[in-house]
Regions:
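Topogenic membrane-insertion module of multi-pass membrane proteins
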Residues: 2-83, 87, 95, 180-183, ...
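Small-residue-rich segments of transmembrane alpha-helices in multi-pass membrane proteins
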Residues: 56-65, 190-205, 252-256, 318-331
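Membrane-embedded alpha-helical segments that form the functional core of polytopic membrane enzymes
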Residues: 63, 73-104, 162-173, 213-233
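Helix-coil boundary and interhelical linker segments in multi-pass alpha-helical membrane proteins
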Residues: 66-86, 147-163, 200-221, 273-286, ...
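Multi-pass membrane catalytic core of lipid/isoprenoid biosynthesis enzymes
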Residues: 112-155, 251-282, 325-327
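Intramembrane alpha-helical segments
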Residues: 122-211
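Extended hydrophobic alpha-helices typical of membrane-associated regions
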Residues: 279-346, 352
C-alpha cells in the first residue's frame, strides 16, 4: 500500500511518526514515517530522534570509498576505516539531535495550523517523555565524541584529513545552530552535496593514504547530489513554514515550480555522474547496478511533481530516504560483485 494512503488522524489529534522526517537538516533531512504512535520506551524515543535512516547519508559514501580502494587492490587499514565509520555515525547522530532540538524550539513559536509536522522528529520530541532540554547536551556530547573518534584518521591521513574533518564538524554544527544558521540560506544545500559526497569519500581515501581519482570524485558527486534530494523535498514540503521563519531556501526564493525543477535536475545529474564514473573502460562497472534504484526514486519524484505544498508532501522526505537506502544497497552490492569477479584478473588501475 502506498504511504500516501495512510489514514489521517482525527482533527486535533497529534500524529507522531518516525524520527527522521524533520524538515531540513544537514544532519540532515531526516527519514522515516513508520508510524504514528510515540514509543513508550525512552530508549526507543532516543533512537528515533537520531534519525537512523539519515545515518546512511554518511555511511554509504564512506563504505563506497573503501569499496573503490578494494577494487584497486589497495590494502585497507582497519583502524582508520573503523574509526571513520564510528566518527561519521556519531557526528551525524549528534547533528540530528541538535537539529531536532533547535527546530522544536524555533517552531514552537508558530501557530499549530502552520506547523504541518506530524511526521517529524520534532513532533516526536514534543509528544514524548524526553525532556527537550536534555537533547541539547546529548547532541553536543555526541559531536565531541565523534570528533575524538576521528583522531586515528588524522594520524593516518595528516593535515588534509584534519582540514576536512574540521570543515565537516563545523558544517554539522553551524547548519542548525546560531542565529545565522547555514540552513537559512539558499545555497546551503550545496554544502550537503559537498559534505555527503566528495568530502566523505576524499577524507576516507586520504586516511587510507590514497588520493581519489577523477572517477572516484564523479561517483562521490553522484552520492552528494542524491543526498541533497531529501533536503530539497523538505523545502518543497515546508515552504510556508520556512517563509514564516524567514528562511531563504531555493523554494521560498525562486518559487515552487523552480524548486521542483531543481529537484528533478539534481536527480538526473546524480545518475548522469554515476554513468560517467562507471561506464568508461577500466571503470568500476559494478557501480552501474545502482541504476536498479531508479524505481524507488520514482515514488518521491511523483510526489514532488504532483502533490501540493504542505501536508500532501509529507511523505516525500521519508520516501526519498528509502530510495537512497535502496541506491546505497545496490551500489555497494555492485562494487562488491565487481571486486569479487575481477579478483583473479588483477585490480582496476587507479587511473582516470
Amino acid at each position: 500500500m502506498d504511504d500516501g494512503m495512510a489514514a489521517q488522524p482525527a482533527m486535533g489529534q497529534p500524529q507522531v511518526g518516525d524520527v527522521a522526517a524533520s524538515s531540513d537538516a544537514f544532519p540532515v533531512a531526516g527519514a522515516g514515517d513508520l508510524p504514528v504512535v510515540a514509543p513508550t520506551s525512552r530508549i526507543a524515543t532516543w533512537v528515533r530522534l537520531i534519525r537512523p535512516a539519515a545515518l546512511l547519508l554518511v555511511l554509504v559514501p564512506a563504505l563506497t570509498a573503501l569499496a573503490l580502494l578494494w577494487l584497486r587492490g589497495a590494502r585497507i587499514m582497519a583502524l582508520p576505516a573503523l574509526a571513520g565509520l564510528i566518527s561519521l555515525t556519531m557526528v551525524q547522530a549528534g547533528a540530528s539531535l541538535l537539529d531536532v532540538y533547535l527546530e522544536y524550539a524555533r517552531r514552537a513559536r508558530l501557530p499549530d495550523a502552520e506547523r504541518h509536522d506530524q511526521l517529524t522528529a520534532r513532533a516526536l520530541l514534543a509528544h514524548s517523555r524526553v525532556q527537550p532540554l536534555t537533547v541539547l547536551p546529548v547532541s553536543i556530547a555526541l559531536l565531541m565524541l565523534g570528533a575524538l573518534a576521528g583522531i586515528p584518521l588524522l594520524v593516518s591521513g595528516g593535515w588534509p584529513v584534519a582540514l576536512l574533518g574540521i570543515a565537516g564538524l563545523a558544517i554539522a554544527f553551524l547548519f542548525s545552530a546560531t542565529a545565522f544558521a547555514l540552513k537559512r540560506f539558499s545555497l546551503a544545500d550545496l554544502l550537503i552535496g559537498l559534505a555527503l559526497g566528495p568530502g566523505i569519500v576524499t577524507g576516507m581515501m586520504l586516511a587510507q593514504r590514497h588520493a581519489p581519482t577523477t572517477r572516484d570524485l564523479l561517483l562521490s558527486g553522484a552520492l552528494g547530489l542524491l543526498a541533497m534530494l531529501p533536503a530539497e523535498g523538505a523545502h518543497l514540503r515546508d515552504a510556508d513554514q520556512d517563509k514564516a521563519l524567514g528562511r531563504r531556501t531555493l523554494v521560498t526564493t525562486l518559487g515552487d515550480g523552480v524548486g521542483r525543477a531543481i529537484y528533478v535536475l539534481f536527480l538526473l545529474a546524480g545518475f548522469t555522474l554515476l554513468a560517467f564514473a562507471a561506464l568508461p573502460k577500466g571503470a568500476p562497472h559494478g557501480a552501474l547496478v545502482g541504476f536498479f534504484a531508479l524505481p524507488a526514486f520514482s515514488i518521491p519524484l511523483t510526489g514532488v511533481l504532483r502533490a501540493r505544498p504542505g501536508r500532501a508532501r509529507e511523505q516525500i522526505v521519508p520516501q526519498e530516504l528509502r530510495a537512497y537506502a535502496v541506491f546505497g544497497f545496490w551500489l555497494l552490492l555492485g562494487l562488491a560483485i565487481n571486486a569479487i569477479l575481477i579478483s583473479g584478473l588483477g585490480p582496476i588501475p587507479p587511473t582516470v
